[in-house]
UniProtKB/Swiss-Prot annotation:
Catalytic activity line of the entry: S-ubiquitinyl-[E1 ubiquitin-activating enzyme]-L-cysteine + [acceptor protein]-L-lysine = [E1 ubiquitin-activating enzyme]-L-cysteine + N(6)-monoubiquitinyl-[acceptor protein]-L-lysine
Bias type Low complexity, positions: 1-26, 34-47, 486-502, 717-726
Origin organism lineage: Eukaryota, Metazoa, Chordata, Craniata, Vertebrata
Enzyme class per UniProt: transferase
Protein name: (E3-independent) E2 ubiquitin-conjugating enzyme UBE2O
EC number in record: 2.3.2.24
Organism this protein belongs to: Mus musculus (Mouse)
Length: 1288
């Protein structure tokens, strides 16, 4: 989809992030504005400037948009999942369409190209694809708990952000008054609660999924009333802002104190009058009102869990899901880290402190109507902050600020320009930059004279002889005609803490201006502007720029404070073996004591050496304290693991589950829900409770409910979870769900789907788009439709050569849409939210309506499938009967019955007699055994094919293919008594970390095979994963198996075969750099960070491979026992010797570095091998990162991989496309990928080419690998496999 269309160029507005002040008394000097070509990265961006990213999500950047400098937020970077962004991609650097209104996107999505980022420009919210080097980083967004590294340091260790300090430049909404600097801790949320907030209600933790709001309004006659936000939305803002119509603006929270609204009297017919004289509600009158306060009157909450509550009730029943206004006082919001979340475009409340000297105000002309052009604000703000500012004047509490101030001061350096010709010029006529800034300095307080009723302090006033008097005479029924510029600004910026009316007339409106008022504006055009205020006043502001500094605790235990965030870069893909000080760990070494009361606390870490200093603690029997065991120990990171229960990170939400510290008696009102503030190396956790009190508490007394929070976000609490069949396959790291390449549009998908279905299909009316529905129910319904429609994929492929008929094209589009809907969350699918345990009476009705619509969709699609299958049957080529029968619901339930009598005959027809072994052309074997082993993963699953003869016909073809086409390194066995079961053994490819290893799989063919893919189970032999796609719970992630949705030939169809899956596992999973198989990690290929992570992953993989092979030697599975022994009698010792040779090579290189004379000799002796490898593996060519993760993982350095012609051709295409960048200067080549990982090795390092990144070996790896090699040797000797002389 194209970028949202933007307003006219004159409307563009942005703000720069000021840098630290150069002089104490002056405003912070801003960074230099970008030039016409936009500034690229500075030359000092680090030693590896060309091998690390320039920008990350949420970065504040500046660049040229529509001819002027704008500021914006990076919303998406290449290789990042676009879940939250949908597919509203822009059009690259060419810009966006000029047509349409701001914030509306159009066109079709385009992929985010390498080297580009998606930027959302402020204030309109237009999204655009821009080249990274055309943007200037103004402020990097980091929050507590982020893992970061130094941008300008050779030190590669990472650290954890423990606190941030954000200085903001804020603009008073409705004006162009800029206040800087304002610390983010001094900004408050406008609304006390918002959607998605986590709250504590007595002992319960919940999440707000809906809320009911109201606004308190004050009329000019002093009357006050309360109005719900639905009616309030019918009023319009007298002082609108450009961002009100852009994507930075949230309609749900569009009201703020001090806002001036106007609307017809009929809207006030249903309000509740609180005080004052109720005005006459004339049909022709219009009321002008000031928002005095915004209130939440009702919360709807999904309850997550209950905490330890000694003084409370023992009931486990959650409170009512609806919290009414009288109980809101018992609700406490978890928001101790709100100050770290401020970003561009956010609206907040600012309370002026008692000491205001540090704050600076720069004021330019009042902001024009959002329909008028403003020019670019970025340069103006920079210039104002750099040159001169308006000095703040502090009024004493009893000093009243008059409404009229017309005194001229000849010493002022400029004129207050009150927006010439507001409302008279069209956007096209308004020139860019017409709203020039005011550069003036207030010389001090002046003798002021009250002319009328005083208004609240902190006013932006303009002189005028008649304007303010006319404001006094403003009646409600005349509000639409009064456009006094001054009083509008006064109202919008007035303090809600004052008891004054705050009413006034409009500075700018979307209604026509009278000639009288237009003349009045021109008359006051040159009047001076001042602003007075008093401490404690609250004003609504909008963040226009930020400057962030962070405190970081590094892995070595040191703490560095006030680091400019631009000098850091976030680490998104963190190795599981990276530990930080304060992490709780357990010992994985076999000789360690498995006492559950013993745990370790990381004191410091050596990132390069891959070791940690750990203190071991043991919980005392009393349970109220711990004792230190032994001395601090230097441990390899591969020998420890995260504690299964004690996982605490800053900002985690926790509940108290145990007694208080030191045996103190629990208080009845003791807080029990809070957030982690700090994890201490002393084995305790500091918690900020919901009442803002702090406690340092033992981890045994806390429970981290982050996992429950994630489940509550995705699962409905009304029904059961997604079912055992789903749960048993899901773990805490579902990284296998890689980018599927499908377009996941949001609401347009529903409309598109409705359009392609037959006319009789009922569709939900437009007003039902906001239905609230549990995601589980919606997902179950959609998955049902997809599961029912999926088998037709193979049917469609059998269409004639002339192309599929229209009915098939429509059906294919419907299936595609359903698949994309299946992968979307409910929040993406609908403008709603998860339901609570108890909902309002009308909610189940709307949910039922949605489910009924989905059910009708399923039924209609099923009818379409049936009709198409019948109508096109004669046009198809031998469509298998099983594909036409698979839609019958009764075939899904297994029925226990005897195997048909023709089974042995079928076995004989395919040569499947028990004990018969077939040797393929490449020397591998396929054999049929008599009985399936009892420990086969799928043996206990009852199976009865609906059409036995047809099913066995398919099996016969599979067996024939396996018997003749198995490649090197794959063995398969099936069983006479269960021909739906298979067992497979795959040898690890050479020049990969998996070489000389054996990897076993159990397989079952479903009853409707081949309409659906086979079931695979990996037989893991170690704790943890040795490959991103092979889980220790048995899950195998390959696109052909449907565990993630691939593209084209990567998807399973009725023509796919078991052999294809086995080859995919061998060639696309067991690769030389498995790290890049992780979802989204392939975008790191060619970056320094990616290389380091890949090397460390290979270290971990090698350790787990040796551990797995040790288990296989000691307890070989029955099916392949003979093959395993035969393999390891030779391959086992080959594996041992190869790793030992790597250890010796590393030791030699270490000695060579210590002795310079020897270094030259050692390096020169080994360098020719490295040079030869480099010439063989490719010439430092750009690499295609657009391939599927599995395909891209098999680099050119691997000889045993399965990088086919298709991959090679794509590589060649990518090289051609990126060739023009070769002549560009280094600063514009930050994302250039290199084919060979060896390019990251130190020059003339002399390390041999082993096919995958491993050198230099870390100290932790050497410690761990020696330990597991010792165990492997012992296992080989115990199994009667002594090392031969040839092996040595």
């Amino acid at each position: 989809m194209a970028d949202p269309a933007a307003p006219a160029p004159a409307q563009a507005q942005a703000a720069a992030a000021p840098t630290p002040a150069a002089a104490p008394a002056a405003a912070a000097p801003p960074p230099a504005p970008a030039t016409d070509s936009a500034s690229g990265p500075s030359s000092d961006s680090g030693p590896e400037a060309g091998s690390q990213r320039l920008l990350f999500s949420h970065d504040l950047v500046s660049g040229r948009y529509r001819g002027s400098v704008h500021f914006g937020l990076v919303r998406l970077i290449h290789g990042e999942d676009s879940d939250s962004e949908g597919d509203d991609d822009g059009r690259g650097s060419s810009g966006c369409s000029e047509a349409g209104g701001a914030g509306h996107e159009e066109g079709r999505a385009s992929p985010l190209r390498r080297g580009y980022v998606r930027v959302q420009w402020y204030p309109e919210g237009v999204k655009q694809h821009v080249k990274e080097t055309k943007l200037k980083l103004e402020d990097r967004s980091v929050v507590p708990r982020d893992v970061v590294r130094h941008m300008r340091s050779t030190d590669s260790q990472c650290g954890t952000v423990i606190d941030v300090n954000i200085d903001c430049a804020v603009k008073l909404i409705g004006t162009n008054c800029i206040i800087y600097p304002v610390n983010s801790k001094d900004l408050q949320h406008i609304w006390p609660f918002m959607y998605g907030d986590y709250i504590a209600y007595d002992c319960w933790l919940g999440k707000v999924y809906d809320l009911k709001n109201q606004i308190i309004l004050k009329l000019s006659n002093g009357a006050r009333c309360s109005m719900n936000t639905e009616d309030g939305a019918k009023l319009y803002d007298v002082c609108p802002h450009v961002s009100d119509s852009g994507l930075f603006f949230d309609d749900s929270y569009g009201f703020y104190p001090g806002q001036v609204l106007i609307g017809p009297a009929k809207i006030f017919s249903s309000v509740q009058w609180l005080s004052g004289v109720k005005p006459v509600l004339s049909t022709k009158s219009k009321f002008r009102v000031v928002v005095e306060e915004v209130q939440v009157v009702e919360l709807k909450v999904t309850w997550i869990t209950k905490s330890f509550c000694p003084g409370g009730t023992d009931s486990v029943s959650p409170p009512p899901s609806i919290i009414t206004q009288e109980n809101l006082g018992r609700v406490k919001r978890l928001g101790c880290f709100d100050h770290a979340q401020r970003q561009l475009g956010e609206r907040c409340l600012y309370v002026f402190p008692a000491k205001v000297e540090p704050a600076k105000i720069a004021w330019e002309c009042p902001e024009k109507n959002c329909a008028q052009g403003e020019g670019s604000m970025a340069k103006k703000v920079k210039r104002l902050l750099k040159k001169q500012v308006v000095r703040i004047m502090s009024c004493t509490p009893d000093t009243q600020c008059p409404r009229d101030h017309s005194m001229e001061d000849p010493d002022k350096k400029g004129e207050a320009r009150a927006g010439s010709e507001i409302g008279s010029a069209s956007p096209e006529e308004q020139p860019d930059g017409s709203a020039s800034p005011v550069e003036m300095q207030d010389e001090g307080s002046e003798e002021l004279q009250e002319t009328c009723e005083p208004l609240p302090p902190f006013l932006l006033k303009e002189g005028g002889d008649d304007g303010l008097h006319s404001a006094e005479q403003d009646a409600d029924d005349e509000a639409a005609d009064d456009t006094d510029d001054t009083s509008s600004v006064t109202s919008s910026a007035s303090s809600t803490t004052s008891s004054q009316s705050g009413s006034g007339t409009g500075r700018k409106k979307s209604i026509p201006l009278s000639i009288k008022n237009l003349k009045r504006k021109h008359k006051r055009k040159k009047n001076k502007v001042t602003r007075d205020f008093k401490p404690g006043d609250r004003v609504a502001v909008e963040v226009v720029t930020t400057m962030t500094s962070a405190d970081v605790m590094w892995q070595d235990g040191s703490v560095e404070c006030n680091i400019r965030s631009n000098d850091l870069f976030p680490v998104h893909h963190l190795d599981n073996n990276e530990f930080c000080p304060g992490d709780f760990v357990v010992d994985k070494r076999v000789q360690s004591c498995p006492d559950p009361a013993v745990y370790g606390v990381v004191q410091s870490g050596d990132h390069v050496g891959r070791t940690c200093m750990v203190k071991w603690f043991k919980l005392r029997p009393s349970g109220d304290d711990v004792e230190l065991i032994g001395e601090e120990e230097d441990v390899s990171v591969y020998d420890i693991a995260d504690h299964p229960d004690f996982r605490f990170r800053t900002t985690d939400i926790v509940i108290r589950i145990g007694n208080t510290e030191d045996g103190a008696l629990p208080k009845e009102d003791e807080p029990s829900v809070g957030q982690v503030a700090r994890v201490d190396v002393s084995s305790k956790v500091e918690v900020v409770w919901a009442d803002n009190s702090k406690t340092i508490i033992l981890p045994q007394h806390l429970y981290n409910i982050e996992s429950e929070i994630e489940e509550s976000d995705y699962d409905s609490v009304e029904g059961s979870s997604s079912g055992a069949s789903s749960d048993e396959w899901e773990d805490d790291s579902d990284s296998w769900e890689t980018d599927n390449g499908l377009v996941d549009d949001e609401h347009p998908k529903i409309e598109e789907l409705a359009a392609i279905l037959p006319a009789e299909q009922p569709t939900a009316p437009e007003e039902d788009k906001g239905v609230v529905i549990s995601e589980e129910a919606a997902t179950a319904a959609i998955q049902g439709a997809v599961a029912m429609a999926a088998p037709v994929a193979g049917l469609m492929e059998k269409a004639g050569k002339d192309g599929p008929p229209k009915s098939f094209r429509e059906l294919k589009e419907a299936i595609k849409i359903l698949e994309s809907l299946k992968n979307m969350t409910v929040e993406q699918l609908l403008t709603g939210s998860p339901t609570s345990p108890t909902v309002e009476p009308e909610k189940p009705t709307r949910e039922k309506k949605f489910l009924d619509d989905i059910k009708k969709l399923q039924e209609n699609l099923k009818k379409t499938l049936d009709n198409v299958a019948i109508a096109e049957e004669e046009k198809m080529e031998a469509v298998p009967d099983t594909e036409r029968k698979e839609e019958k619901p009764e075939v899904q339930s297994p029925v226990k019955a005897e195997w048909p009598s023709e089974t042995p005959v079928l076995c004989q027809q395919c040569g499947g007699r028990p004990g018969v072994t077939f040797t393929s052309a490449k020397g591998e074997v396929f054999s049929v055994l008599e009985f399936a082993p009892s420990n086969h993963s799928f043996k206990k699953i009852e199976f009865q094919p609906p059409e036995a003869k047809k099913f066995f016909s398919t099996v016969r073809k599979e067996m024939a293919l396996l018997a003749t086409s198995l490649p090197d390194g794959i063995m398969v066995k099936t069983f006479e008594d269960r021909m739906d079961l298979f067992s497979a053994l795959i040898k690890g490819p050479t020049r990969t970390p998996y070489e000389d290893g054996l990897y076993l799989f159990d397989i079952q063919l479903p009853n409707i095979y081949p309409a659906v893919p086979p079931h695979f189970c990996y037989l893991s032999q170690c704790s943890g994963r040795l490959n991103p796609n092979l889980y220790d719970n048995g899950k195998v992630c390959v696109s052909l198996l449907g565990t993630w949705i691939g593209k084209g030939t990567e998807r399973w169809t009725s023509k796919s075969s078991l052999l294809q899956v086995l080859i995919s596992i061998q060639g696309l999973i067991l690769v030389n750099e498995p790290y890049y198989n992780e979802a989204g990690f392939d975008s790191d290929r060619g970056l320094q960070e990616g290389y380091e992570n890949s090397r460390c992953y290979n270290e971990m993989a090698l350790i787990r491979v040796v551990q797995s092979m040790t288990q296989l030697v000691r307890r070989p599975p029955e099916v392949f026992e003979q093959e395993i022994r035969q393999h390891f009698s030779v391959g086992g010792w080959r594996l041992v010797n190869r790793i030992e040779s790597w250890l010796e090579t590393h030791a030699m290189q270490e000695r060579a570095q210590v002795m310079p004379n020897g270094a030259l000799k050692d390096s020169s002796s080994l360098e020719p091998m490295a040079a030869a490898e480099l010439s063989d593996s490719g010439r430092e060519e750009p690499e295609d990162v657009g391939m599927a993760p599995g395909e891209a993982s098999q680099g050119s350095d691997s000889e045993g991989g399965a990088q086919g012609p298709a991959s090679a051709s794509r590589d060649h295409t990518e090289q051609t496309e990126t060739a023009p960048d070769a002549s560009a200067p280094p600063s514009v080549r930050p994302k250039r990928r290199r084919k060979s990982y060896r390019s990251f090795l130190p020059e003339k390092s002399g390390y041999p080419d082993i096919g995958f990144p491993l050198f230099p070996l870390s100290k932790g790896f050497i410690k761990s690998i020696r330990g597991v090699l010792t165990q492997f040797r012992a296992a080989l000797l115990e199994a009667g496999m002594p090392e031969s002389t040839e092996d040595k």
